[in-house]
């Protein structure tokens, strides 16, 4: 009998790991807390289980929802392995380490360390006021640096948002949801499009649109603005119809340094060609402003405006 997208029961053995509990569910995966039976370490396991394509059979096997979806499920599973293999080759303090990946139950599993800390989205919900400039720089400069490494290796994350940023001790950030990461030179599987309202730019809503590092840049800008205002920006499709979003440099003037507001506005340009081409471009533009900010010589908004961002 095929069941709906049911999680595996606590105590289930998958490879060399014993599952403890489900700790998350996404559009394409189930996430478990588990124990490594060889080392005793606590780990996090992501199971490839796209809710629009897959069902669970008795015994734990993952099968397509219908015969028509078999090819898409197979293709998605193959891409899952290719993408995890690519990520395993990257080493960065803000990119989660891949400990293991394997095939079981006719699907793929990704094993990661269980990092202690808190989720940025949850942290924002608990705060009564906005966050400081220092906090934003501590979190998002390393995130941009991690994305820059991915972009240099022709990979894009495609789902950067506060809910996918984990804060460790000292607010050291860790990018989560590696299952959304996609190599630029590979075709996207049907049903694999990730869209998060408020953080996904307009090109991400259309299957034939070209995605690239600039797609991640928009999401970073939207995430920073969420931290500043404690609310999610309007969805890109709404902005495409009628852009009522007031620029950050106008809406938040005096609350944050001009250079940071300009960076947010540049990153959140509706047209991809008007954004920084990748995370490195935005980071390179930010660096001299960061140096001046840390020494107390903060530039004004007018002086710091990047090319392509118009004053309103």
Model-inferred region functions:
Residues 20-26, 31:
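Protein kinase glycine-rich loop
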Residues 58-89:
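AlphaC helix of the eukaryotic protein kinase fold
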Residues 101:
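Activation-segment/catalytic-loop signature of the eukaryotic protein kinase fold
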Residues 105-119:
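Conserved short submotifs of the Hanks-type protein kinase catalytic core
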Residues 120-131:
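AlphaC helix of the protein kinase catalytic domain
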Residues 139-140:
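Activation segment signature within eukaryotic-like protein kinase domains
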Residues 143-155:
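Protein kinase catalytic-loop region centered on the HRD/HxD motif
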Residues 198-294:
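C-terminal lobe helix-coil module of Hanks-type protein kinase domains
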């Amino acid at each position: 009998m095929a069941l709906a997208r049911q999680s595996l029961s606590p105590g289930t053995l998958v490879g060399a790991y014993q599952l403890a509990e489900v700790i998350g569910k996404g559009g394409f995966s189930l996430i478990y807390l588990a124990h490594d039976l060889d080392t005793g370490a606590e780990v996090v396991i992501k199971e490839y289980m796209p809710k629009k394509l897959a069902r669970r059979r008795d015994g734990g096997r993952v099968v397509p929802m219908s015969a028509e979806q078999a090819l898409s499920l197979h293709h998605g599973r193959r891409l899952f392995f290719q993408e995890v293999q690519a990520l395993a080759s990257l080493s960065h303090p803000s990119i989660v380490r891949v400990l293991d990946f394997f095939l079981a139950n006719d699907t793929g599993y990704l094993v990661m360390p269980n990092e202690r800390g808190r989720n940025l989205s949850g942290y924002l919900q608990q705060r009564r006021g906005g966050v400081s400039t220092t906090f934003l720089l501590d979190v998002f400069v390393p995130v941009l640096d991690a994305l820059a490494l991915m972009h240099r290796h022709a990979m894009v994350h495609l789902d950067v948002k506060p809910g996918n940023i984990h804060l460790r001790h000292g607010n050291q950030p860790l990018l989560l949801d590696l299952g959304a990461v996609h190599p630029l030179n590979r075709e996207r599987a049907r049903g694999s499009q990730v869209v998060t309202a408020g953080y996904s730019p307009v090109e991400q809503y259309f299957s034939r649109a070209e995605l690239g590092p600039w797609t991640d840049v928009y999401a970073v800008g939207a995430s920073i603005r969420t931290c500043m205002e404690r609310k999610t920006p309007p969805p890109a499709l709404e902005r495409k119809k009628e852009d009522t979003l007031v620029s950050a440099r106008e809406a938040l003037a005096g609350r944050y340094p001009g250079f940071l507001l300009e960076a947010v506005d540049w990153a959140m340009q509706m047209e991809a060609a008007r954004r920084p081409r990748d995370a490195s471009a935005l980071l390179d533009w930010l660096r001299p402003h960061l140096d001046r900010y840390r020494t107390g010589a903060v530039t004004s908004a007018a002086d710091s405006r990047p090319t392509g961002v118009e004053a309103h």
